[in-house]
């Protein structure tokens, strides 16, 4: 019974995680995944609206109060939960799997200590390293770290909280209340922002989890094969399906821990692999998670027919100069002096943009260079 509840819970968590991770990608635009993510994102506002209409905002007041009480400890609850989960997995491995592996597959015995070391080191680095906090001391240097593309990041935009000009690709993180250079996202699992300086450690952390969960599934699977073979050695034919054989072995009391290790490793390992692949895809695109969301907004505006771009047939652009017009044809901004000079020198004309492909991402330097920039960020200190 509990195993079925666990499997259903994992399935539900996997669906919601997939929707939130990938639903904003341009490839899913106007699909059921994209629409479901948008619907979920609007639920908090819808609940507050319902509360305001029918309960006079009382539920929101209670919720805000409860949030203020648990807020100081809440950020660390997920990392603590992660550490507890990891500790349980390794203790279960050494009690139920390691003797079998050491006796029958000794060449795999080194995997556990190596994986545990990688997890601990990567978790500490990702959790406690500086993501690229922008301060008065390093602001001038970080301001010149990246060019302004005037698409997602406009010049002379001030952070309303920190009261200084926002460097390109930066964002004020509302969870940690600080501006972060090359902001990617805030990660609950490490209770830290992922940015310019610690993105490499975050990747290290992801790869460490992928490594651990994959070998966990492999080693638990090796023992499951032996247990299933022993259980059905003298079983009358025809034998049940492979799935039924594995399921029956996993739900017996003496095999439950091995079954749990296998199921946890496979289910969470699939999510870890998908999440890691997504981040390498972002590196390939030359974009952060935050910027991918912004690109989604640009694609939506193009679909609405409100985006115009300076271009010329046959001319290869090295930057994109875009304007968004309202219903009355008024542009959202004025061109900078540098943009006006670029348009005049190359004889570019303002035309309606019907496809996102002509847009140049100035931050994309090719996959290898993008990866190099992630692994070896230029220090601003």
UniProtKB/Swiss-Prot annotation:
Its EC number is 2.3.1.225. One of its GO terms (molecular function) is protein-cysteine S-palmitoyltransferase activity. Residues 157-207 form the DHHC domain. Residues 26-64, 129-201, 279-381 are cytoplasmic. InterPro entries: Palmitoyltrfase_DHHC (IPR001594), PFA4/ZDH16/20/ERF2-like (IPR039859). The active site is at 187 (s-palmitoyl cysteine intermediate). Pfam families: DHHC. It is found in: Endoplasmic reticulum membrane. Palmitoyltransferase that targets several endosomal SNAREs. Palmitoylates the SNAREs at cysteine residues close to the cytoplasmic end of their transmembrane domain. May have a role in the cellular quality control of transmembrane domain-containing proteins. This is Palmitoyltransferase SWF1. It comes from Yarrowia lipolytica (strain CLIB 122 / E 150) (Yeast). The gene is SWF1.
């Amino acid at each position: 019974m509990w195993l079925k509840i666990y499997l259903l819970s994992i399935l539900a968590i996997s669906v919601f995680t997939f929707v939130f991770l990938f639903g904003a990608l341009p490839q899913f635009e106007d699909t059921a995944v994209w629409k479901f993510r948008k619907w979920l994102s609007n639920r908090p506002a819808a609940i507050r609206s319902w509360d305001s209409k029918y309960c006079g905002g009382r539920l929101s007041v209670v919720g805000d109060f409860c949030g203020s009480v648990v807020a100081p400890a809440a950020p660390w609850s997920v990392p603590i939960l992660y550490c507890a989960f990891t500790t349980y997995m390794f203790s279960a491995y050494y009690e139920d799997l390691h003797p079998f592996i050491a006796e029958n597959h000794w060449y795999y015995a080194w995997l556990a200590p190596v994986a545990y070391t990688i997890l601990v080191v990567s978790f500490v680095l990702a959790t406690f390293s500086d993501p690229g906090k922008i301060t008065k001391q390093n602001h001038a240097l970080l301001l010149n770290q990246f060019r302004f593309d005037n698409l997602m990041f406009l010049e002379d935009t001030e952070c309303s909280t920190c009261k200084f000009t926002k460097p390109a690709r930066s964002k004020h993180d509302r969870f940690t209340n600080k501006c972060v250079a090359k902001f990617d996202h805030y990660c609950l699992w490490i209770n830290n922002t992922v940015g310019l300086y610690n993105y490499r450690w975050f990747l290290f952390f992801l790869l460490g989890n992928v490594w651990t969960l994959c070998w966990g599934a492999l080693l638990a699977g090796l023992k499951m094969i032996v247990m299933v073979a022993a259980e059905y050695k003298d079983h009358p034919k025809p034998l049940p399906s492979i799935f039924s054989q594995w399921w029956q072995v996993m739900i017996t009391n003496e095999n439950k821990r091995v079954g749990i290790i296998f199921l946890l490793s496979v289910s969470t390992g699939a999510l870890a692999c998908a999440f890691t692949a997504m981040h390498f895809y972002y590196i390939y695109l030359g974009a952060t998670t935050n910027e991918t969301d912004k690109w989604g907004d640009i694609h939506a505006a193009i679909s609405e027919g409100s985006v115009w771009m300076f271009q010329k047939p046959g001319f290869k652009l090295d930057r994109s100069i875009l304007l968004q017009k309202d219903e009355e044809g008024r542009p959202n901004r004025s061109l900078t002096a540098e943009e006006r000079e670029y348009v005049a020198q190359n004889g570019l004309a303002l035309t309606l943009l019907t496809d996102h492909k002509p847009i140049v991402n100035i931050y994309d330097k090719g996959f290898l260079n993008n990866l190099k920039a992630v692994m070896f960020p230029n220090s601003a200190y």
